[in-house]
Amino acid sequence: MITVIISVDPSTKFLFDIVKSLKSNSIKFELIEVHPNNASYKNCLDKIKELPENNTILFLGHGQDNQIYGGELLNGYPKQPLVKRNEMGIFKNQNLFLLACDSASLIKSSFRIAKTNKAIGFGPLPTEIEEVENDKKLANEGITLDTIELFKQAINETVILSLLEFFKDESKDFIFLKDYLNLHLNKRINKAILEEDNRNLADLLFNMKNDMVIY
């Protein structure tokens, strides 16, 4: 069984392309949208608690090293923590894929609490210009809004290809998803360097691959 959880938020709208691609390729899954209101947050948590063990859960949204977030409405409902580090046990005995900033650190620090079968997470994923401006290293490298838009497209492209390959072979263990991600990120990095001459995009993709963990 596959469950996709996506936080509804203007800045994560691009991630709905992943949902659309799974649907168009006839991948069966349950979709849980976390809208910017208390009832939707609670509904999501209630549904997670009811999931059978050994489910594959994909979370698409924002995160920090101590939590993942639900939906946000600008000037209306600021994003709230959906699951904090000490609450990660809600994913016990599940296969967890967290496409969210700093989810690698969250997975590492909550490993004993969460007791997931396996979990995949990432480091920083700068998808907004403010995130670049707040990171001196990225700002000094000259990462532009255009680079960020290309990075968002590349995230979707590599994640979609990896998920489709993984889900279409039901005999594969969850750890193979990381192998597919490494493969497609490497291909996209090579394309950025050799065909597009875009070193900044290649660096962002390299960091995404390098910071990815499985626990």
Go through each PLM region and give its residues.
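Mature extracellular/periplasmic domains of secretome proteins
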Residues: 45-54, 82-89, 109-114
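A domain-level signal for caspase-like cysteine endopeptidase catalytic cores
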Residues: 1-60, 95-100, 171, 176-181, ...
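Short, solvent-exposed linear motifs at loop/edge-of-secondary-structure regions
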Residues: 88-104
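Structural alpha-beta junctions
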Residues: 21-33, 92, 113-125
